[in-house]
UniProtKB/Swiss-Prot annotation:
This is UDP-N-acetylglucosamine--N-acetylmuramyl-(pentapeptide) pyrophosphoryl-undecaprenol N-acetylglucosamine transferase. Cell wall formation. Catalyzes the transfer of a GlcNAc subunit on undecaprenyl-pyrophosphoryl-MurNAc-pentapeptide (lipid intermediate I) to form undecaprenyl-pyrophosphoryl-MurNAc-(pentapeptide)GlcNAc (lipid intermediate II). Belongs to the glycosyltransferase 28 family. MurG subfamily. GO terms for biological process: carbohydrate metabolic process; cell division; cell wall organization; lipid glycosylation; peptidoglycan biosynthetic process; regulation of cell shape. The gene is murG. Its EC number is 2.4.1.227. Pfam families: Glyco_tran_28_C, Glyco_transf_28. It is an enzyme of class 2 (transferase).
Length: 409
């Protein structure tokens, strides 16, 4: 039976790739034993159990970029997380460990590497994080989502890098527009816009969306807008004077991404790598608003890549206003031919086969490990049998004494 340990957390961008990988393994190996390692406060504590997987939690937090007392406390949490991860790995005895990013995956991958357990990193972004760069030297394999990210890894990891793309959840890949619209009670004739600012929401996008929502209500356009849980009450208070119709929904968090994405004609969102993988897998035109504070400014790079290929429009946060977003939305909705061209461009970027490529690489590592283990076990068995034969054919010291002590007659 295959035993797999996955770790990734903090944001949906790290959790959902792990879910996609776990689902693929479970589909191919129904008897596989799969567990996740995350934190109690991370979004993984809500998402992982919903997909029917066991979640073990550890205490760990990411570091702030400035040096302060809070960072000192986080150092102690890191050591605690390392010890907790070590115990989980030791007890579960996984055949393979897979990390999909977020601060929680670091201690897990580190302990796997130190324990000589095959370990794989999946890097979603074009600019790998510091932890993944360091661990890439010790893990078995590094799966990447952007080919140009390879130049940003250490030279010691060069032979371990494999370009696979970002995995998209099966329910999204299998979703269809007509069925999704029926599920959401949205007629085929209506134009429909989906907007979300990542798993935690975006205040910048929320501020700009108030005007857009007002005008979409006036134009009788269907929409689903996810504000982020922490912003929901505030946002709903700010649009209390607007009467929404049943097919015009504002929600704190998007539980059913598959139907919402499939039903849409236009998507507005941030430039997280997984969000873009999902958008392009279904061939959706988009308005991409990269978050400005991301590491290495990788979201801006992602957004400009989408725009350069004609699949979307990028609006930087510093240029985002209610008016600029409203203009972009209604220009696109008013030009069906342009939307179709953008949709086709988006579809060519999408990599729906990524999950199969990732699974193949995982199985290569797993199978090679099993062969090595089998050879080792066979060798140990042979050595044991040789020792037994030698023991049976070699007289003991006591036996030798008795033989020497026999007197000749």
């Amino acid at each position: 039976m295959m035993k797999v340990l996955l770790s990734g957390g903090g944001t949906g961008g790290h959790v959902y790739p792990a879910i996609a990988i776990a689902n693929k393994i479970r589909d191919e190996h129904p008897d596989a034993e799969i567990i996740f390692v995350g934190t109690e406060k991370g979004i993984e504590s809500e998402i992982v159990p919903k997909y029917g997987f066991e979640l073990k939690t550890v205490t760990v937090q990411g570091f702030k970029r400035k040096i302060d007392f809070d960072n000192v406390k986080r150092v102690f949490k890191l050591f605690k997380g390392l010890e907790q991860s070590r115990k989980i790995v030791k007890k579960f005895k996984p055949d393979i460990v897979i990390g999909t990013g977020g601060y929680v995956s670091g201690p897990v991958l580190f302990n796997a590497s130190m324990g000589k357990i095959p370990a794989i990193i999946h890097e979603q972004n074009s600019f790998p994080g510091v932890t993944n760069k360091i661990l890439s030297k010790t893990v078995t394999k590094v799966l990447t989502s952007f080919e140009d990210s390879h130049k940003r890894f250490p030279e010691a990891a060069e032979d371990k890098l494999v370009f696979t793309g970002n995995p998209v959840r099966k329910e999204i890949l299998l979703s269809r527009k007509n069925i999704a619209r029926k599920n959401l009670s949205i007629s085929d004739e209506k134009r429909m816009v989906l907007c979300y600012g990542g798993s935690g929401g975006s205040r910048k996008i929320n501020d700009a969306m108030r005007l857009v929502i007002k005008n979409m209500v006036n134009e009788d356009i269907a929409f689903i807008f996810a504000t982020g849980k922490s912003y929901y009450d505030e946002f709903m208070g700010s649009i209390s004077d607007i009467n929404l119709k049943p097919y015009q929904k504002v929600v704190p968090y998007l539980e059913d991404m598959a139907n919402a994405l499939a039903a849409s004609d236009l998507v507005i969102g941030s430039a997280g790598a997984i969000s873009l993988a999902e958008i392009t897998a279904l061939g959706k035109p988009s308005i991409i608003i990269p978050k400005a504070y991301t590491a290495e400014n990788h979201q801006e790079y992602n957004a400009k890549s989408i725009e350069k290929q004609g699949a979307g429009i990028a609006i930087l946060e510093k240029n985002l206003t209610p008016e600029s977003l409203n203009t972009a939305v209604f220009k696109l909705l008013g030009d069906r031919e342009l939307l179709v061209d953008m949709a086709n461009a988006s579809k060519t970027i999408g990599k729906p086969e990524a999950i199969d490529l990732i699974y193949d690489e995982i199985m290569k590592v797993y199978n090679s490990t099993q062969k090595s283990t089998s050879k080792k076990t066979k060798k140990e068995k042979v050595i044991k049998e040789v020792k037994e034969i030698k023991k049976e054919t070699t007289p003991s010291i006591e036996g030798q004494a008795k033989v020497i002590g026999i007197k000749k007659r």
